[in-house]
Curated annotation (Swiss-Prot):
<dbReference type="GO" id="GO:0005829">
    <property type="term" value="C:cytosol"/>
</dbReference>
<dbReference type="InterPro" id="IPR006175">
    <property type="entry name" value="YjgF/YER057c/UK114"/>
</dbReference>
<dbReference type="InterPro" id="IPR006056">
    <property type="entry name" value="RidA"/>
</dbReference>
<dbReference type="GO" id="GO:0019239">
    <property type="term" value="F:deaminase activity"/>
</dbReference>
<dbReference type="InterPro" id="IPR019897">
    <property type="entry name" value="RidA_CS"/>
</dbReference>
<protein>
    <recommendedName>
        <fullName>RutC family protein STK_08110</fullName>
    </recommendedName>
</protein>
<dbReference type="InterPro" id="IPR035959">
    <property type="entry name" value="RutC-like_sf"/>
</dbReference>
<comment type="similarity">
    <text>Belongs to the RutC family.</text>
</comment>
<dbReference type="Pfam" id="PF01042">
    <property type="entry name" value="Ribonuc_L-PSP"/>
</dbReference>
Amino acid sequence: METVFTEKAPKPVGPYSQAIKVGNTLYVSGQIPIDPRTNEIVKGDIKVQTRQVLDNIKEIVKAAGFSLSDVAMAFVFLKDMNMFNDFNSVYAEYFKDKPPARVTVEVSRLPKDALIEIAVICSKG
């Protein structure tokens, strides 16, 4: 088991790792829209926040030797399901050809009052 950390993604806001690599599988902790340069939530709508979350995930999987095409499963937590279509429009830019399996649920609140959080599982082979 290997801990994955990159300065190109935000530091965890609690006692957990950015990601854990076990063999050919990578477990990426839930990411919220924190700009790693400022350590603050990005200001903006669900599209802006989704883009930041996916950029953070992209950097974490890259640091572990994976890519977004290796994402097998995504877990998405939205503050408001009315944001679903706008979220999907940005999400589709990152997962064009073979999107991963996905769960999307509405939650009452997220850390730092983010609008979105995404966790992923990647697999090679």
